Amino acid sequence: MKVTIRINGDVLSAYIPKKDLEEPIISVANEDLWGGSILLRNGWRLALPHLPQEARLPVTVEARRMFGRLDRGAHEKPDRMTRIGEISSSQDAAAMLAENQKMHPWPALTRTAYEDVAACISSGELSGSGLGIINAFERRMEEWIGGGYVVSASSGTAALTVALIALGIQPGDVVLLPSYTWAATALAPLLIGAIPRFVDIDPNSYNISPTALAAAITPDVKAIIVVHMHGISCDMDEIICHAREQGIAVIEDCAQAHGALYKGQHVGLLSDIGCFSMQKSKHLSAGDGGFMVTRDPTLAQKMRDICNFGLPTPKANYRFDEVVRDGYAVFRECEQIGGMFRLQPMSAALVMHQLEHLRQRIAWLQTAMEPLVEESAKIPFFKITRSHVDRTHVWHKIRVGIDYAAVDYFGRSMAEIRRGLRNSLAERGISSTLWTAPILPLQTAFRPYAGVVEWTKSAGHLAIENSFIVFDENYPLIAQEPAKMAELVVKLQQAWDEHFTSLARGK
């Protein structure tokens, strides 16, 4: 039957192949609905794409049939999804931008994923510790990483927090971390009363600088968190050497580095604890979720207990009620500080099948990036982080840098040069973002911990001020259409040539 939708005054009419669906007229004026969905009669759901507030772009509305009663956990099957139409755009450039932002649905789910989640719901195992699906996920993840003990968590932020607690970090202890990273890296120590101290980065890799790290180590430093930014490993040998000399624990934040290797070893296995995120924008996505990995079985058990309120989780040949104190069985007693940091079982089910194809997707992405890296090296004032012979880059994001020599050459500010290049890319359908800017010590929440460093003159600040991220920050690069990746190098060259000519003309 025909469906008519009014979207901010525009009318979209299309057909849903279900004869018993009455013809509804829906008005959508609230921008908060973009990216959400509307549930119709007979179980159809209309999924509305996310739109920028400042632009009227082509809209593709998807209809999905929900199977089962809505009040009993109805689920949808991807093979019954129907694309039902578009509304017109007022600008060709905006239309191209919207078209080029189309990506594979992410996470990339198969029918098996839907069936696994439905089976999880049917099993009734929706919460708790030591559940079968959680154990299966952890064992599968250990195999995929190639060693260690995996402990699941509710998020990457939770994983970092649990790791710090497990390593004995106390209120007032100092934790070193890079100035350029996502806020969660600094929030984790603050959540347990520790003090983050920021360390400058290497402007070529955007990872923490080992030299700056060595200079920042003082007697009150108890832990170091390194972040493998955008999918390439830090210089771990040098970092571990500095830490071990001082007896300092090291945590790897691997939120953007699923599949990344350093000298043949998977990141996360190179330190005391590796922490991973499974938020939607990651290579491995559960919507939200995370996990830790360590080579130390005692540390793994401690983290498992911390994730379960600090309660001892079941061990082999052990029963809670076997412990007797003052004539009473001790069934539940917190043995340490913890919280409810457990991974949701349905999230584990959602992720399990993704591992089967993740290496293949990463390999495709690495192949797609080779010509981009090579050709970008020929563009004046351009730079894209290259991989190293001793590590594997998994390209979570592409950060395009502009050499500061361009400022002197053109006599323009870096902000003007960067803005013009981004506009030129947008005209060719390539979106971009600044992602997290400014660097953390210049953000309001973290200024009290910035110390005496002039961060506006730091390598990290300058590196972020003269660069930007290509494509949508809410999706990993791996979610891009292959055709769009193939076109990217050409469009980057075209955008820069046009912008270069414009800047040169204005000299």
From Swiss-Prot:
Source organism (scientific name): Rhizobium meliloti (Ensifer meliloti)
DNA-binding region(s), chain positions: 256-275
Similarity field: Belongs to the DegT/DnrJ/EryC1 family.
Function per UniProt: Involved in the biosynthesis of the rhizopine 3-O-methyl-scyllo-inosamine. May have a regulatory role in controlling the housekeeping genes within the nodule which are involved in the biosynthesis of the rhizopine backbone.
Keywords: DNA-binding, Pyridoxal phosphate, Transcription, Transcription regulation, Two-component regulatory system
Gene field: mosB
NCBIfam families in the record: nifT_nitrog
Mutagenesis or variant effect for residue 92 to N: In strain: RM220-3
Residues with the N6-(pyridoxal phosphate)lysine modification: 282
Coiled coil location: none
Name the record gives this protein: Protein MosB
InterPro entries the record matches: DegT/StrS_aminotransferase, NifT, NifT/FixU_barrel-like_dom_sf, PyrdxlP-dep_Trfase, PyrdxlP-dep_Trfase_major, PyrdxlP-dep_Trfase_small
Any single Pfam family the record assigns to this protein: DegT_DnrJ_EryC1
GO biological process terms held by the UniProt record: nitrogen fixation; phosphorelay signal transduction system; polysaccharide biosynthetic process
One Gene Ontology term of the molecular function aspect: DNA binding
Superkingdom per UniProt: Bacteria
